[in-house]
Amino acid sequence: MIQMQTMLDAADNSGARSVMCIKVLGGSHRRYAHVGDIIKVTVKEAIPRGKVKKGDVLKAVVVRTRKGVRRPDGSVIRFDRNACVLLNNNSEQPIGTRIFGPVTRELRNAKFMKIVSLAPEVL
């Protein structure tokens, strides 16, 4: 469950290390974002010579949460850290060309197939 002010790791090679959620998109008073939801983030920590810099405001898709994802068979997939993949504000395609760490099968819709194909492991 990601809400405003939540700090997340950037799970791609866009140049951001740490980002903060500033808005949960989709609905007028939506409070929480889960895996597969799009959020608005600001870059809090970035590496030198990256594609993004500190202070940039971008869209991102949540790929891992500590809360986890409940599957229809009753199992829950949980992670140690909250993580997201940064997206282009207009096209909503990933900024980075590599994804680090596993992603969940819940991202396998038409919008995020690029992220699933780049990920080293799909749980």
Curated annotation (Swiss-Prot):
Q: Which InterPro entries match?
A: Ribosomal_uL14, Ribosomal_uL14_bac-type, Ribosomal_uL14_CS, Ribosomal_uL14_sf
GO CC field: cytosolic large ribosomal subunit
UniProt keyword annotation of Zinc present = no
On whether Ribonucleoprotein is a keyword of this UniProt record, the answer is yes
- UniProt cross-references to PROSITE patterns, sorted A to Z: RIBOSOMAL_L14 (PS00049)
**Function in brief:** Binds to 23S rRNA. Forms part of two intersubunit bridges in the 70S ribosome.
Q: Which PANTHER family match?
A: 50S/60S RIBOSOMAL PROTEIN L14/L23, LARGE RIBOSOMAL SUBUNIT PROTEIN UL14M
Q: How does it assemble?
A: Part of the 50S ribosomal subunit. Forms a cluster with proteins L3 and L19. In the 70S ribosome, L14 and L19 interact and together make contacts with the 16S rRNA in bridges B5 and B8.
Q: State what protein this is by name.
A: Large ribosomal subunit protein uL14
The gene for this chain is: rplN
